[in-house]
């Protein structure tokens, strides 16, 4: 009787799941430490790079109208007036946002009136200024009202200047609402308090950047 000897292949050692998880965790920790060290050594480079990655901007170009949305009276009507003087647009639309209690009492100027006065002082005639919408409450309702104006008036291109950090959200919202009905351009404008290369030195810049990141995510999820 012949004895049979069974041979087996050497067992292949596989890393345990726990070991692999530990390696991934350590790699992530190492990356975070290195990134933190780099940011500590060169914080301005990192912060400036973050702004460059976030900010999107269209070049101003001839358009049927320029729209001035709610807020940002320190820079939005100024940009619109500049485009008008350069002959890029002959019509400036002003968002008709809802009046605040103080505005209803006549203590404060309405958004439409305040922007209209700024535009006229910058050389834009009253005949070139037109309000759009009614009691608009946020960027999305402004985009919808602006789209309705464009369709009603046969507009093919509209420029909507906004600040550097809000440009990404506004650009996405306009493209989402307008579709292929008209071209929307969103030039990113520096607010008077900060620019892309020094935003972290100003409280409004810090708050503005973080708020816009959250708003952008909210808009993408909601709309």
Explain the meaning of each model-derived region.
Residues 12, 42-201:
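A structural signal for short, hydrophobic/glycine-enriched beta-strand patches
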Residues 9-56:
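N-terminal type II signal-anchor transmembrane helix
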Residues 37-41, 80, 217-221:
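Structural signature of transmembrane alpha-helix termini at the membrane-water interface
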Residues 202-223:
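A transmembrane-helix-recognition feature enriched in membrane-embedded lipid enzymes
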């Amino acid at each position: 009787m012949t004895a049979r000897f069974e041979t087996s292949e050497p067992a292949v050692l596989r890393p345990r799941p726990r070991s692999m998880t530990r390696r991934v965790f350590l790699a992530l920790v190492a990356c975070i430490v290195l990134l933190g060290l780099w940011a500590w050594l060169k914080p301005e480079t990192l912060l400036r790079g973050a702004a460059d990655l976030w900010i999107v901007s269209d070049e101003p170009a001839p358009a049927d109208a320029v729209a001035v949305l709610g807020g940002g009276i320190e820079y939005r009507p100024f940009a619109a007036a500049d485009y008008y003087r350069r002959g890029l647009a002959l019509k400036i639309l002003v968002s008709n946002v809802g009046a605040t209690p103080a505005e209803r009492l006549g203590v404060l100027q309405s958004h439409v009136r305040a922007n209209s006065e700024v535009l006229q002082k910058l050389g834009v005639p009253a005949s070139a200024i037109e309000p759009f919408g009614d009691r608009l409450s946020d960027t999305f309702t402004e985009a919808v009202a602006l789209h309705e104006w464009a369709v009603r008036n046969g507009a093919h291109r509209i420029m909507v200047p906004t600040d550097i950090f809000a440009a990404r959200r506004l650009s996405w919202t306009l493209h989402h609402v307008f579709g292929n009905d008209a071209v929307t351009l969103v030039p990113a404008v520096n607010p008077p308090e900060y620019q892309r290369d020094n935003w972290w030195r100003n409280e409004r810049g810090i708050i503005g950047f973080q708020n816009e990141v959250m708003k952008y995510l909210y808009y993408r999820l909601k709309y």
